Curated annotation (Swiss-Prot):
It comes from Bacillus subtilis (strain 168). Keywords: Cell membrane, Cell shape, Cell wall biogenesis/degradation, Glycosyltransferase, Hydrolase, Lipoprotein, Membrane, Palmitate, Peptidoglycan synthesis, Signal, Transferase. Transmembrane segments: none annotated. This is Putative L,D-transpeptidase YciB. It is an enzyme of class 2 (transferase). GO terms for biological process: cell wall organization; peptidoglycan-protein cross-linking; regulation of cell shape. Gene3D superfamilies: L,D-transpeptidase catalytic domain-like.
Amino acid sequence: MKLSLFIIAVLMPVILLSACSDHAEEHASINTKKTVENITDVRKTAKTSIDWTKPSGGEYPDIKQKHVWIDVNVKEQKAYIKEGSNTIYTMMISSGLDQTKDDATPKGTFYVEPERGEWFFSEGYQEGAEYWVSWKNHGEFLFHSVPMTKDQKVIKTEAEKLGTKASHGCIRLTIPDAKWVYENIPEHTKVVIS
């Protein structure tokens, strides 16, 4: 009888505390896991603004003696300067909104056309841009800087969209990236947009 009372009085609380402790650890583990998942979700959805006044990929490559082409990935919102299958530079872009056929970036293989310039302004869109290079329809679809007002001031609300679908169909770039394309990418350079 004394042994039974000893088991009930002493060992039972120890067993119960041990079980509760394991259960508490399980809850702590689940809560920690959920917290980590929530932090990860916030990081996935938090958008880091791209500085449109700087090159988006660091130091530019020397391509004077190289045969390059441009691979535009609309899903990733990046333009890859490639030599063969090797990526030699990556630029952040904004392609067309893709909400209608009028604001979509055409997909396919194109070639840089002879039209290019240091500045344009569209009365219809009330937006302009620096350093434009045509790649389709001789001045309709362009690589160019982030949008600007008629007096050549950056439209910050539009520039802050760099890295997301935001344009009327053109490929927006940081100002230095657009200038580099304007100065370095020759006519007839292949442009693949997918």
